[in-house]
């Protein structure tokens, strides 16, 4: 009994061990298969199949990185050389979407006959649309787009010409107004200007015996007050006014000659000499008027005491 039981138990254990070894073999086989599949796949496919990793970017990024490592720009970029303001040349990477190398559009060259017909139509009507434009393009062997663009450019040119004409007219008008104003001011100044008075014969031709009135040197007294010489025919106690003071134009003194003193005698306009009392004559001292007043006061005081 016990032998059979042990033999049965050993068989079950062997079966279990066999089953366990088979499961391990199966797991190992699966792992080896997965490894071989991963090894056979390309790096791009493996990166796309494994989410959550840094290699899960699109294929372009990997290609860009590969191009950068190789020093080659990607297909959508291009390099150009630019000279800055300082004269240094720099290399700039720009996207090809800008299309900098696009050839310029060729300008349409019109013949003399076409220009003549287009100009006639423009003088007739500045806007040609519809059937008229189609017919004109057919007659001139041009496309409607070319005719339309020509009329647009012609209208723009006409506006520019009109603007220039108006600017020139306004500038010329302002210049003419300024010129008229200047001429008017000059005319007013000429009319308002007072003619110069005639020269004084007495000053121009002095008496040969006595010399010029202004040119005669003044004689200084002991008190320091200067007095001028008196012309003939005038008394020592006379006092007059000069013609130059009446006319309002003072005579210009000569260089090196002191100005005339305040006390001088000149005949008046009437020619008569109005003699003043000797008490009001010119004295030799600047303090004489005060002395005269004191003398009068003393005389009045003496009269009062006598009376």
From Swiss-Prot:
Residues 25-38, 159-170 have a biased composition (Basic and acidic residues). GO terms for molecular function: DNA-binding transcription factor activity, RNA polymerase II-specific; RNA polymerase II cis-regulatory region sequence-specific DNA binding; sequence-specific DNA binding. SUPFAM superfamilies: Homeodomain-like. Residues 1-70, 155-175, 197-254 are annotated as: Disordered. CDD domains: homeodomain (cd00086). Residues 103-162 bind DNA. This is Ventral anterior homeobox 2.
